[in-house]
Amino acid sequence: MAIKVGVLGAKGRVGQTIVAAVNDTDDLELVAEVDHDDDLSLLVDSGAEVVVDFTTPNAVMGNLEFCINNGISAVVGTTGFDEDRLAQVRSWCASNEGVGVLIAPNFAISAVLTMVFARQAARFFESAEVIELHHPNKLDAPSGTAIHTAQGIAEARREAGMAAQPDATEQALDGSRGADVDGIPVHAVRMSGMVAHEAVIFGTQGQTLTIKQDSYDRNSFAPGVLVGIRNIAQHPGLTVGLEHYLDL
């Protein structure tokens, strides 16, 4: 039986890509294309089992509350999740057993692997900084991917008992050292011609390591989204990060 899929934000750039990707499979059935002017009841009426959400930070929580309370699992690429929002999603899931929610800062497999590799490398280097580069229409900075990457690096450093990074800066223009994410500097670039890119730079005595990832178009997100749709039934509750669905 094909998995019945609905797409929220279906007329957006990423949404259109996901619609095309689902239609190009044999094991998934697109049953609902919902945009901001449409009623969410279309998801229930169509029998959607899994919803893909690429909407806006202002809309996503209402979308998730509706889906979870109606027994529909959700694969979410929308940004804007902080700890309070994640806690709310966990609460909704706890009241609706069997529903799965996958929230991923990035669905590009190369970006997911960058985050995993960065965490693995973190304990071997004194210093680490993250640079993310995106198109100028992106609403948030730094990106969720960069934040997630920095948090993983910081956690790995804590687990290894490492001290704070060396940095003798005493005078700096506001923002020149980037945002501080758990002690890891994160720098955001917004530039025409870019889509989604990230570089993680590590340094220690006499050597550096750069892990770099590039998404050149939005088709890069589709394979990861399809992984989420196909596997979410085996992951009830909230999962943050596509890496938990991959055999790494």
UniProtKB/Swiss-Prot annotation:
Annotated PROSITE patterns: DAPB
Binding site for (S)-2,3,4,5-tetrahydrodipicolinate: 135, 144-145
GO biological process: diaminopimelate biosynthetic process; lysine biosynthetic process via diaminopimelate
Principal location: cytoplasm
Pathway field: Amino-acid biosynthesis; L-lysine biosynthesis via DAP pathway; (S)-tetrahydrodipicolinate from L-aspartate: step 4/4
Catalytic activity: (S)-2,3,4,5-tetrahydrodipicolinate + NAD(+) + H2O = (2S,4S)-4-hydroxy-2,3,4,5-tetrahydrodipicolinate + NADH + H(+); (S)-2,3,4,5-tetrahydrodipicolinate + NADP(+) + H2O = (2S,4S)-4-hydroxy-2,3,4,5-tetrahydrodipicolinate + NADPH + H(+)
Keywords: Amino-acid biosynthesis, Cytoplasm, Diaminopimelate biosynthesis, Lysine biosynthesis, NAD, NADP, Oxidoreductase
InterPro entries from the UniProt entry: DapB_C, DapB_N, DapB_N_CS, DHDPR_bac, NAD(P)-bd_dom_sf
Binding-site residues, NAD(+): 9-14, 77-79, 104-107
Active-site positions on this chain: 134 (proton donor/acceptor), 138 (proton donor)
EC annotation from Swiss-Prot or TrEMBL: 1.17.1.8
Cited Pfam families: DapB_C, DapB_N
MF GO annotations: 4-hydroxy-tetrahydrodipicolinate reductase; NAD binding; NADP binding; oxidoreductase activity, acting on CH or CH2 groups, NAD or NADP as acceptor
Coiled coil: none
SUPFAM superfamilies per UniProt: Glyceraldehyde-3-phosphate dehydrogenase-like, C-terminal domain, NAD(P)-binding Rossmann-fold domains
GO cellular component, one term: cytosol
Superkingdom to which the source organism belongs: Bacteria
Enzyme kind, highest EC tier: oxidoreductase
Cellular localization per UniProt: Cytoplasm
NCBIfam families with a match to the protein in the record: dapB (TIGR00036)
Task performed by this protein: Catalyzes the conversion of 4-hydroxy-tetrahydrodipicolinate (HTPA) to tetrahydrodipicolinate.
UniProt family annotation: Belongs to the DapB family.
Descriptive protein name: 4-hydroxy-tetrahydrodipicolinate reductase
UniProt organism field: Corynebacterium efficiens (strain DSM 44549 / YS-314 / AJ 12310 / JCM 11189 / NBRC 100395)
Gene coding for it: dapB
